């Protein structure tokens, strides 16, 4: 399930490694997209209120302000926001709130330089007619975080993951872990449009 060839970072495995390392009382928030699906599939929780997501509402940009609220409400618990490069840019200004309030929340930014879920649907259901899903002109996310006084790290290889997660979780203040992942990685299983849960696609045929 977590076997993946090559040196590239495999998002499901990274999130499983995060799940194994995070404190039992850790709160995880997500934005919307492939990272949201992977987080729901591969991060375990001890209580239902420890996973905060907008589910099927599709509210990109939800994850960071949700993490801010969770950290204010539970100042003694670890809060981790799982985001994607598309969603993160929707409410990136909330890094100002993180700095102003000195909130020690952590951000795992899974960056495939795509609107990944939209790209996957265009691949599977629209004959690979890709439109407005490429984000190769993303900003330098570490420089952006640094402008708000938030430290971070950028990783690109699977052998960097464990040490990077440990550094993030052990940091005293806010922290951004920028993770480059394969732009063509898909989420499985997937329910096609108009289908039922008994008609899930297990992989690309």
Regions found by a protein language model. Name each.
Residues 45-50, 121-129, 197-198:
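Short glycine/proline- and charge-enriched loop/turn segments
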Residues 36-37, 58-60, 88-89, 113-117, ...:
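Short gly/pro/ser/thr-enriched loop/turn and capping motifs at secondary-structure boundaries
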Residues 73-164:
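Conserved thiamine diphosphate
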Residues 1-65, 70:
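Active-site diphosphate/adenylate-binding microenvironment
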